[in-house]
Amino acid sequence: MAGPLWRTAAFVQRHRTGLLVGSCAGLFGVPISYHLFPDPVVQWLYQYWPQGQPAPLPPQLQSLFQEVLQDIGVPSGHCYKPFTTFTFQPVSAGFPRLPAGAVVGIPASFLGDLVINTNHPVVIHGHTVDWRSPAGARLRASLTLSREAQKFALAREVVYLESSTTAVHALLAPACLAGTWALGVGAKYTLGLHAGPMNLRAAFSLVAAVAGFVAYAFSQDSLTHAVESWLDRRTASLSAAYACGGVEFYEKLLSGNLALRSLLGKDGEKLYTPSGNIVPRHLFRIKHLPYTTRRDSVLQMWRGMLNPGRS
């Protein structure tokens, strides 16, 4: 066992710079490629296909999206390609400043009858929605958004794409890897472990790797929380109507999650909290801000706009 382990350690030591550069390039390239080439990938994943055919974007949704772009003041040279998605929330990817542009998936439920029709079967997590039940009626009501709430949901995606924060997220992993490697090598030299026993060096490297992952997880979650909070505040600041739509959007989102919690039974209790937030999948991490926190933030902004003297 010592032979292969020594050979592996010697190989890593001999090619450590190349391995580091290759690993950093891979950690940056894989997530960023999703946004550099969004047109075929995102539409293939999220396109709404009623009756086996991709649904074209209806004129009313196209008009709604163009209105959002005008409200935000997006330059005419930025490229956006909206399409109809089967999801209940908008999806987006890409860089609007680049030639490939950005894509934004607009939920078919924004039209109302396409998905919310009680004669149209909907399966969620393996459970067919019973629209006649109280929870089914609540879910149906949560999918019916006002024009202001729809505009808030779309504007939030456009603001995110215009900010190019995707590149910052993609840079975080390689930056943490390079930082962990540099600090680990420096600590080995400082403590005199570089020429010490291999077992001791391996143990130190393992501790450094764990510390690096913890730093990455904390940085990733903190950045995500900051971006989500900024997106809500930036979108709500467009006007009082957008802020009001944001409050409705998150209220309907929480109401829909509570309906799903009831419809899915025990599976729903594992997915959603009694307040409608998503149950964290990791014990020591909260990857996203709770929806209640985001709703309260937008609600506070809306109240401040209605009563500027009290803000």
Curated annotation (Swiss-Prot):
InterPro entries in UniProt: TMEM177 (IPR026620)
Subcellular location(s) per record: Mitochondrion inner membrane
Any single Gene Ontology cellular-component annotation: mitochondrial inner membrane
Membrane topology, from the record: Multi-pass membrane protein
Domain of life: Eukaryota
Ranges of the Mitochondrial matrix topological domain: 1-17, 188-197
Residues spanning the membrane: 18-38, 167-187, 198-218
Topological region Mitochondrial intermembrane: 39-166, 219-311
Keyword vocabulary terms for this entry: Membrane, Mitochondrion, Mitochondrion inner membrane, Transmembrane, Transmembrane helix
Oligomer status and interactors: Found in a complex with COX20, COA6, MT-CO2/COX2, COX18, SCO1 and SCO2. Interacts with COX20. Interacts with COX1, MT-CO2/COX2, SCO1 and SCO2 in a COX20-dependent manner.
Function text: Plays a role in the early steps of cytochrome c oxidase subunit II (MT-CO2/COX2) maturation and is required for the stabilization of COX20 and the newly synthesized MT-CO2/COX2 protein.
Family according to the record: Belongs to the TMEM177 family.
Name of the protein: Transmembrane protein 177
Organism: Homo sapiens (Human)
Encoding gene, per UniProt annotation: TMEM177
